[in-house]
Amino acid sequence: AMLSRFGHKLRVAIDGKEYTGTYMMAAICNGGYYGGGYQAAPYAAMDDGLLDIVLVKPISRIQVAGILAKYKAGRHMQDADTIVPEFRSFMTFYRARSVEMQVLDNRPIIATIDGECAPVMELKAEVLPSALNVLLPQPACSSAVIRGQYECPLQAKVR
């Protein structure tokens, strides 16, 4: 979700590697979509043990208006690891097992987790492999099949 129109100075540790910068938005995703159908991480797979992380540096409202539809549709990603050229000057992408964020400007960010919002000064997200069994519909297998990892058992039955 949008952190603020001006951004926040954050220290972000991604699998232990630290980055410091001003960001207006951060999306930490285990699945491809969040609130209202935004496809922040179009290649995310819930079964790969990794989080897909999108960080956005502050841009103008005019720029936001120009790119929002593409971002919502997941067209900011060229492939599973690459941001499209149009977004590269202000957007970065990472894939990791854990991410920690700490606010450095003394103004809390609003974290939204599963639709619940809370002001926080720091947060940590980490994948705990096989900690939870989740029943997914057939399309959930598609990302792993596209990446060639395995054949989805549900798709095999349909053929």
Predicted regions, residues:
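Long C-terminal subdomains/extensions of small-metabolite kinases
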Residues: A1-R159
